[in-house]
C-alpha cells in the first residue's frame, strides 16, 4: 500500500510540470537517444503589441546568440540522453525553413502558441547531424491574462499583459511533436508591460494604468546576472532559469520509485535507427 501511495505521488508530480510527453516515456526514450538542440528561434510573425516591436526583435536576436550552448550544457548534465548535440544555423533561416505554421492552444491564462514543422526540413537536419530528434525553442509574443503584484505584494492587477513567452517542442524526423512545453501560466520569459501602481497612488486614482517596459529596461532584464556556484553566476539569469526548467522537464526517466535509479541510455548500435 505504501509503495502504491509513493507511486501515486510521483505520478501527480509528473503532471505538475510545464512540459509534457505526447507519447509514453519509455517510447520517447527508445526513439530519442541523441537529441539535437537548435539555436533559440524568434517568431517575428507574432505581434508583440509594443510600440518598439522591431527593436525588441533585434534585441532578442542579439541576446539569444550562442545561448543554446547553456541549454546543451544543462541537458548533458541531466544524463538522460546518449548524447546532446548543438545544431548550427542562422536562427531566422531555421525558423522559416522549419516552421510550417502556428496556432493558439489553450485558453485564457493557459493560452500558448503551438507550432507545426516541415517534415522534410526536420529530416534534413536530423540526417545531417545524426540525431534522433530536434529540440526547438521559440520565443514569441503573446497577450494573455496574468496577475501582477505591486512592489509591496499587497495589491495586484489582473489584466491582459503582453509578454515574450516560450514554446518548445521535441520533433522527430517525421515532423511529429513528441514532447511539448506550452508556456504554463506565470512562466512568461520576458514581461513587456507592467501596472503602474505608483502613478495611481500619487494621483489618488482608482484605475491603474498598464504601461510598456522600455527597450533599455528589457535589455537590462535579459543581461541581468547574479552570483552563483560553479561559474553559473556569469550566465544571464533569465536564460539559465529557462534552460534549467526545460532540462528538468525533458527527462523521460525522471520519476523513479525510491531506491530505484534510472538506467543510463544505451548507446545506439551501428547507425542510429529512426522511427
Residue spans for each PLM region:
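Acidic/histidine-rich, surface-exposed loop or edge segments in extracytoplasmic proteins
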Residues: 38-58, 102, 221-227
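C-terminal/domain-edge helix-coil "capping" segments
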Residues: 17-36, 45, 144-147, 158-165, ...
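N-terminal post-signal-peptidase region of extra-cytosolic proteins
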Residues: 20-21, 56, 115-122, 149-156
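Sec-dependent signal peptide recognition
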Residues: 2-9
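C-terminal motif of bacterial Sec signal peptides marking the signal peptidase cleavage site
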Residues: 12-15
Amino acid at each position: 500500500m505504501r509503495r502504491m501511495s509513493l507511486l501515486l505521488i510521483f505520478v501527480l508530480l509528473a503532471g505538475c510540470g510545464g512540459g509534457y510527453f505526447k507519447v509514453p516515456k519509455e517510447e520517447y526514450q527508445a526513439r530519442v537517444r541523441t537529441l539535437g538542440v537548435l539555436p533559440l528561434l524568434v517568431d517575428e510573425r507574432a505581434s508583440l503589441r509594443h510600440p518598439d516591436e522591431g527593436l525588441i526583435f533585434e534585441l532578442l536576436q542579439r541576446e539569444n546568440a550562442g545561448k543554446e550552448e547553456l541549454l546543451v550544457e544543462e541537458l548533458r548534465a541531466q544524463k538522460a540522453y546518449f548524447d546532446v548535440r548543438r545544431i548550427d544555423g542562422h536562427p531566422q533561416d531555421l525558423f522559416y525553413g522549419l516552421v510550417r505554421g502556428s496556432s493558439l492552444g489553450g485558453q485564457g491564462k493557459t493560452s500558448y502558441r503551438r507550432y507545426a514543422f516541415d517534415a522534410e526540413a526536420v529530416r534534413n537536419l536530423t540526417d545531417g547531424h545524426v540525431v534522433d530528434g530536434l529540440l526547438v525553442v521559440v520565443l514569441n509574443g503573446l497577450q494573455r491574462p496574468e496577475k501582477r503584484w505591486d512592489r509591496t505584494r499587497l495589491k495586484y492587477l489582473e489584466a491582459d499583459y503582453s509578454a515574450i513567452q516560450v514554446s518548445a517542442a521535441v520533433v522527430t524526423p517525421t515532423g511529429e511533436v513528441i514532447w511539448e512545453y506550452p508556456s504554463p501560466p506565470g512562466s512568461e520569459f520576458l514581461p513587456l508591460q507592467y501596472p503602474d501602481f505608483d502613478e495611481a497612488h500619487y494621483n489618488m486614482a482608482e484605475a491603474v494604468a498598464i504601461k510598456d517596459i522600455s527597450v533599455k529596461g528589457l535589455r537590462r532584464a535579459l543581461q541581468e546576472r547574479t552570483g552563483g556556484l560553479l561559474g553559473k553566476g556569469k550566465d544571464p539569469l533569465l536564460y539559465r532559469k529557462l534552460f534549467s526548467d526545460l532540462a528538468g522537464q525533458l527527462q523521460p526517466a525522471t520519476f523513479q520509485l525510491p531506491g530505484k535509479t534510472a538506467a543510463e541510455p544505451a548507446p545506439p548500435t551501428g547507425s542510429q535507427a529512426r522511427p
